[in-house]
Amino acid sequence: MKLKYILLLSCVFAQLWAVGEAGAIFLLIAPGAGPQGAGEAQVAKADDAYASYYNPAGLGFLKGTEVAGMHVNWLPNLASDLYYEFITYRHHIDGLGSLGGHIIYLNLGEQIGMDEFGNPTDNWKSYMGAIAGSFGTHLSETSAIGFNFKVFHQKLSDQV
């Protein structure tokens, strides 16, 4: 019986020392000067092409066609070859709703390879990217529904 309690307590406290790692962290970089200036509070104000990123349901209320983009030298004091690109597009189709999408690219620059003894090896370039498709349509004067589909890829090393 004592062994059961020890095992149970071990399982409970094992999570306290678990290592957590985040993947595709570049998806948390907020695109657009307006949303960044508002502390990323863009979900309720989905009135432009950035709605495909923040709130695809907002596309349902938009008419016309729009393209928007953003380029940022990411962490310029750390390295000169880090940059973030974002481009988005939306197009309204009468009687259906609005289609949209965006492309995100974060260049992490050139990485310097080292072996376990500190000797230089081959250098390589790292990057992260994502592409998303969006659709939004209004259900009534005050409500809409939207969907987002996103695929991302990271190349952090030349080694598998």
Please name every model-derived segment.
Residues 3-14:
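Sec-dependent N-terminal signal peptides
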Residues 19-160:
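Subset of outer-membrane beta-barrel
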